[in-house]
């Protein structure tokens, strides 16, 4: 499990959370 993969996954989760909660 590489840090780069974790970073990308984190950004994806952030974007999903932003889209769902409308808190950007």
From Swiss-Prot:
Location(s), subcellular: Secreted
Q: Which GO terms describe its biological process?
A: defense response to bacterium
Instruction: Give each disulfide bond as a residue pair.
Output: 18-24
Pfam families cross-referenced by the UniProt entry: Antimicrobial_1 (PF08018)
- Can you quote a single GO CC term? extracellular region
Expression by tissue, per the entry, reads: Expressed by the skin glands.
Keywords, A to Z, come to:
Amphibian defense peptide, Antibiotic, Antimicrobial, Disulfide bond, Secreted
UniProt-listed InterPro entries: Antimicrobial_frog_1
The UniProt entry's sequence similarity note says: Belongs to the frog skin active peptide (FSAP) family. Brevinin subfamily.
What does this protein's UniProt record list under function? Antibacterial activity against Gram-negative bacterium E.coli.
Q: What is this protein called?
A: Brevinin-1Sc
Q: Which organism is it from?
A: Lithobates sphenocephalus (Southern leopard frog)
């Amino acid at each position: 499990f590489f840090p780069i993969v974790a970073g990308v996954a984190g950004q994806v989760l952030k974007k999903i959370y932003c889209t769902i909660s409308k808190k950007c």
